[in-house]
Amino acid sequence: MPAQLIATVNGGTLDQYDQASEKLMKPGFQAGLLHHACVPLDDGFMVIETWESEQAIQDFTGSEQFQSAIAASGMPMPDIQVRPVHNVVSK
């Protein structure tokens, strides 16, 4: 069942996001990722992703590569919420 990841990074910058994304968006690393969007906030940013399953999210966010990329960028650790998805529409 698809799942949604919502990661809020209070105090993070878009430069930090770009730096971490450069490492995290390499082909093959994000197996199961269907959609990704980054939304600027007044004090940080939010990443909204749709994945093939909650397990795919856990595999990604629990990986050494994920933890290392976040730490190397200098951004605060994201507050991550995961929820099941009822319906996905792509156009």
Could you say what each language-model-derived stretch is?
Residues 1-64, 73-91:
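Short S/T/G/P-rich N-terminal loop/turn motif that feeds into the first structured element of a domain
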Residues 66-68:
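Short, non-transmembrane amphipathic alpha-helical segments
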